[in-house]
Amino acid sequence: MIDCASDILGLVDVQPTFMPGGELAVAEGDATVPVINRLLRQFDHAFATQDWHPPGHSSFASAHPGHQPYDVITMPYGPQVLWPDHALQGSANAAFHPDVDLTKVEVIVRKGFHPQIDSYSTFFENDRRTPTGLDGWLRQRGFRRVFLAGLATDFCVAWSAEDAIRLGYEVVMMQDACRGIGVPLGNGRTTMDEAHERLVSLGVQMITSDQLGA
């Protein structure tokens, strides 16, 4: 199923800050690590993203007096969920998880370092216009299909998948190599439900590692 010339595995924010014990812990986030390592053995090429925030970043609830984590405010680029302080530049929890084998990772994209704008997607800042440079690198290398794994399903992975589709890539989400946050939206729905419906409607393929032969 994998075309070693045109397929690439993308690892999204596989950092302790998003795992149990981290500042913005995703339930079972650490369970993605062994699956990701199995996937890495199947691919010849990989890239990784790293959330990398300065202190006082505008997406932190602590930067907005009177607000709490998971409140939603309006920023110049649109709605913004406010997060606990996390992925602080240079901190141990902002590093990649130490058990992830980065041998095949050919490029690392740091995101979220601009103080006044958040960055979920591997391709664009949250204004959906400012590029990270990843698209140009992938095109120069001739990659056409992106397999995504990492954290969190309903934010950084989902936004990455959506932008990749918009840019003309085929996208496969490795469901057992991802975990989500699930922010409540009301009516019993969460951001996980919304993300899944949106991505399926866009044509993102959802599979698990056993379907890939990993």
Predicted regions and their residues:
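Active-site-adjacent betaalpha module
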Residues: 1-10, 14-18, 22-25, 31-45, ...
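Short HxH-centered metal-ligating active-site micro-motif
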Residues: 50
